[in-house]
Amino acid sequence: PSAFGAEVVWWENDFPAVRPLIGDKVEKVRDLVKPKVTAGELGRILDYTRVFLERTEGKIPIRLGDIQGPLDNAALIFGHTAFLEALITAPCEVHRLLDMITGLMIEFTAAQRDFVRAAGAEFVPSSFQPWLPDGRGISVANDVAVMLSPELHDEFGVPYLNRLSDALGGVYIHSCGNWTHLFPSLEKVRGLRGLEFGASEAPYEKVLARFGGRTVLACRVGLHRDIRFAGMADFVKRVLAAAPTPRGLFIHIDITNGLVDESWPETDLEELYALLDAGNPDWPALAGRSKAP
């Protein structure tokens, strides 16, 4: 958003925020032009990339900056309420902005990759876990999608995810919240490398049943206030029990993006290792069943 001219507000004790640039004045979109890859905070990311490369002498991999995704960036530039309204009342202007954002994301990713490769370091094109090999896609935050119908996501989400995928070798999509209503739309995304989600937010049983074995599923505890796990071991047990296959399953064994309280027990890593080693007793039977004619 800052590359397009939106003001970033740096709170003292919280994450930064963006003041909407467009609001209800949709005509402002017509005056926007695609920025350079050094505009706004993008330039700062590239500067930090250079510094990190110099100080590590190119020996440590460098991740893609967290540049979010087309829908998320457009919503920040508009302001979320104005953006959701504009999907219905001003679709041409929304598509114009999404087109510029997508092009800028592709160009910025290439620029950061070039800096990293020129230093002889490994470029990791994902800003969240797990590791994604260079050339196999790009991580995309698609949080705004949870507020869209499948039809709106088909129109305003999928074309730009596909453009990113075609240009960069795939997309690895993160979304907070419950996006299970978008299953049919997400299946239209080309080169879907993975889905990153909170188990308490997007019901993990449904996600695993629909996409298990088809793409990487990176599952974390989640931030739902009313749906809780009784500890990390309980979380791991329940995810393993629901997973139809271990293929592509990645379980976040941390609470960085998990809502827990004082009742959360201390995590016993040895217990987790044993659970992961044991897996799901149904997996061999399921694997055999999938091979049956």
Regions found by a protein language model. Give the residues of each.
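Active-site loop segments of alpha/beta catalytic cores
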Residues: S2-V18, K34-P293
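Residues forming anionic-ligand binding surfaces in small-molecule and nucleic-acid pockets
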Residues: L21-D31
